[in-house]
Amino acid sequence: MSGFTRYNKILNLFSEQRSSWTVLEISDELKTPSSTIYRIVRELVLAEFLESAAGAYFRLGPAFIKFNRIINLSDPLVRAGQPFLKKLANENPIESVNVLARLYGNKVMCVADYKSPFFKNNTSYQKGKLMPLIYGATSRAIIMKIVGKSLEDLLKQETFYDDNDKDTFFKNLKNDNKKGYCKTEGQVDKGLIGFAVPINNKKLGIEASLSSIFNSIDFLPEHEPIIYANLTSYSLLIERYINQIFDDIQNYHQISS
């Protein structure tokens, strides 16, 4: 291991399922001498990316909490959209989970969410969790506005069951564009139905979506136009606020220079 890769590989070992590691365990997992791992872990502890846990174990450190706060206060999409998620939930006709998600490379990540107090199930779309690109309304709404070679490049590493599955995907994407929103049921989580609309800002390089997720058992056809109207209204508000944030950033840099 060399350069940043060595730090990245160690940090990526930590997960919800495995939150603490010893130097020896990391050494075995990465097939790297324990002396090398010890030196890197010591550097990560000094930088507060890791901290000592019980015994000889280490866990993720306070640096991540600090950076999470900075992102929450500075990220344009989070700043513009998070305040509206609870309002959207309150205006939806049934209990819902409401999600802001964004494209990072070729994966989708939830950056903010709000769950109605009486919503019974959990969704896979949770803050900080990477999600598949081609399944679920939340993800599909993001890529429905990407066209041509950009879309081809984005989907290069995606695996479809067969050519028919791929054709169906593009046909659905075309229909989504005509309707202005995506709707899927059970693609990511069984028993849940999702609706999503795109949010874009080319100046800030933001390709994102706003979505509402419901229990399928609660959903009635007459809810659909209300859900679509709510999502559309709030997505326009969020895009307007993102534009204001862009103007603020631009003005700040002009004054600084």
Task: Describe the residue ranges of each PLM region.
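A structural signal for short hydrophobic beta-strand segments in well-ordered beta-sheet cores
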Residues: 49-51, 101, 199
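Short strand-connecting beta-turns/loops that link adjacent beta-strands
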Residues: 55, 105-106, 202-204
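Amphipathic alpha-helical effector-binding/dimerization core
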Residues: 60-154
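Extended hydrophobic
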Residues: 163-240
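Juxtamembrane membrane-water interface segments immediately C-terminal to a transmembrane helix
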Residues: 29, 75, 225-229
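Short, highly charged C-terminal tails/helix-capping segments
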Residues: 244-257
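N-terminal helix-turn-helix
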Residues: 1-74, 236-240
